[in-house]
């Protein structure tokens, strides 16, 4: 969708050429006296447009309005969550008219957060997946809304927020695209090709490692998962450099299982098709880099994506097999369907070479997290309170929320093995937590967080499809880090290398 930002009052929005005009109406009084504002005020007074966010009133050919159809949408207090509810309801209603051009205007003042929420919600409500669909007789099968003009009281005041939101939407839609693709349209090789395309963006570089390079690195755990598939594995390394070279990067690690049968520990047939979504962690990393390449914030970011299929041919790993990870730790594979942690652990070890300021892994990791949190919030695991607060704040800002879960050491008891350094599963109880405890073993001493997006990465049923989460959360976190100056931190090792020796300090003091 093509977005445009303009300074528009309600009266000026009424004069804009469009197929549908959407007016976002907050609970504050309307003071304008133009015909449409007066009509809105009358509708509110009569109770036809309640203040509750998401309530709608549709009008046909109101006086002095160019658009033939007008949708009034309540946004309540005007906060991001309320704006999102109102915009999604309004855009869904507008789609019934088959419009190509829509004008959407705030009736009252709107800040940057409200504008960002409106852009994200409009894109979300109008998104249509088309890659594997045939075109209709008129040559169209995608979203009907091609152009949306967003009207605000002062476009200059919210321009930066609008630009960031538009870039974030591009990242979310890239994540949706690759999440929605079936396994034969999204192999590790094809995913790596998509990453290489991102390498053409400003300040973004991409490197792709294959089976030989992965074996040479000693990534025995990752390679073991991949060995049951005819599709070769790929290890994707993305780098965005918006800060100085000595700035410690944030490393994002995305699980890239492009299809998960469960391996020898075979999944049930029902809903196995949804295991194409098991690479949504990887898709979120690609989507985040898509946004970074457009926004170009002053921060350094590394993206790591271990990608393979989890299949079950004669070469596949078996329950009871012991594999050696890149860290040197051995792992007893008690369940081959707990493969995500087996590929992530090697990527976490690889992340250490970047001397990161923080590492965040993103994975559709456990059904237990779905049971705990449903599809509303992603699970957040970290022992670092500052990182937890920053990620939770980013989730609230972007309406891509997460919820922190515990990491008590007692949860790791079930991971003990008689035959290896650690087992890859620990029983049913607290499954999301024990999976996070497994990953924590490989995070070393750097600041680390794990986002379990098994409940939030896609929807099932009639609305089946990728959500693009948590691209919004990740971009919001990185942007706030860049703005706050936290991104300027130099890694401790690099700082130590820069520190002059005692002899040099003594010589200077004698001068």
Curated annotation (Swiss-Prot):
The protein's Enzyme Commission number? 3.4.11.1, 3.4.11.10
Q: Name one GO cellular component term.
A: cytoplasm
- Spell out the subcellular localization from the entry: Cytoplasm
- Kindly list the positions annotated as binding Mn(2+) 2: 255, 260, 278, 339
The prosthetic group or cofactor this protein requires is:
Mn(2+)
Q: Name one GO biological process term.
A: proteolysis
Q: What is this protein called?
A: Probable cytosol aminopeptidase
Organism, by scientific name, is Variovorax paradoxus (strain S110)
Instruction: Name the lineage.
Output: Bacteria, Pseudomonadati, Pseudomonadota, Betaproteobacteria, Burkholderiales
